[in-house]
Amino acid sequence: MAAFDEMLPEVSGLRRPYEAYDRWLKEQDPARLTQKMQDAERVFRKTGITFAVYGEQEASERLIPFDIVPRILSGQEWRRLTQGIEQRVQALNAFLDDIYHRQEILRAGRVPRELVAKNEAFLPEMIGVRPPAGVYTHIIGVDIVRISENEFYVLEDNARTPSGVSYMLENRETMMQLFPELFQKIKVRPVENYPQLLRQSLAAVRPQSAKGAPTIAVLTPGSYNSAYFEHAFLADQMGVQLVEGQDLRVVDGHVAMRTTEGYKQIDVLYRRVDDNFLDPLTFRPDSALGVPGIMDVYRAGNITIANAPGTGIADDKAIYSYMPEIVEFYTGRKAILGNIPTWRCSEPDSLKYVLEHISELVIKEVHGSGGYGMLVGPAATKKECQEFAKKLQAKPSNYIAQPTLALSTCPILTEKGLSPRHVDLRPYVLVSDRIQIVPGGLTRVALKEGSLVVNSSQGGGTKDTWVLDD
């Protein structure tokens, strides 16, 4: 099955969102574009935009490849996507509030109780705890794939600590530096105000104990974390402190950070530390990344933690398979954005089907991320399929399977000119007293020809994403 090309489909020819860009592109000298690609790489190296790769003996720091051909969406396409994203985010927040309180969806049998109760991402410590302003998922990254002109599907809900937004911002800034004339010719909706929107959104969910303008900080695990650049970047762009666990302590029932003038109360903590490491008195006792006693402060309502502890259950891949039911249960309407069909390997009939068709399917770990721990059947060897089948049979509940979809393609610039590569899209959503969706998001691209894996940890790159102001 041929993939749908978002710029130049085989059937209909050049699509309207790309018309103005295509006219400009045809006027360009190929040598100039090649030079601009090299300029972009120099910009990223100078800025220090890297990510860490674990499990490799070589240097752990990598530059994420950037392609200068933008992905372009019309305003109409974006409006439809935002409607579906907003509906889904509302349902996710309602689901989290429900499972940590009344558990109506479990009592109704729409989601199996054991799937929640036995899930390692479900935190019993959060039962009965309502976060300030009732918001659990303050920042969400919804991964979306496209199959055809009008078919978009949600691939994954990143409701814990979604990353990549710094690349979205730097991609746009770099494109505007390299091609200022393009942004004069084509009206593209801005993304550069994201840090200000993020700060405003976090301030809007401050706890009632906050006095005056809330003090906000970004909690990072430290410089060895793969996304440390982003943590520092966002703190700097928002004009707030970047802190580590060792900088914080509980003082008089509040979390406070160490300053030259003593300890200062923190009202909102945008944490990029996983749940298990957040509080050694509540979770992992060996954690040096969190703050001893912070969960007591949180339960007392004296700090906002974004995202709330326990939100990981909402982006669990087994829970994902129930998202159509979850959306309908809490919104009363069918999901605007559908799911990719999913086989739950914990179910005997599904496991049987998956084992029989393993070479045709994409199989993922329920708690996996970053493209690790997955099998792309059509790209795997017979031996790899056999070895993965043993894992499935040993722990079927650890896996889900999905059909291998022909993800849409967008052109990238290669030595031989433009060439199509598969892409996905991660729009970023901010939730406070309202839902705000950044126009565009991060387009991830599988740079290897024929590959469907877009994750940067697996060799993927990124593109600037344009939403036309039409």
What are these regions (language model features)?
Residues M1-D470:
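Preference for protein termini
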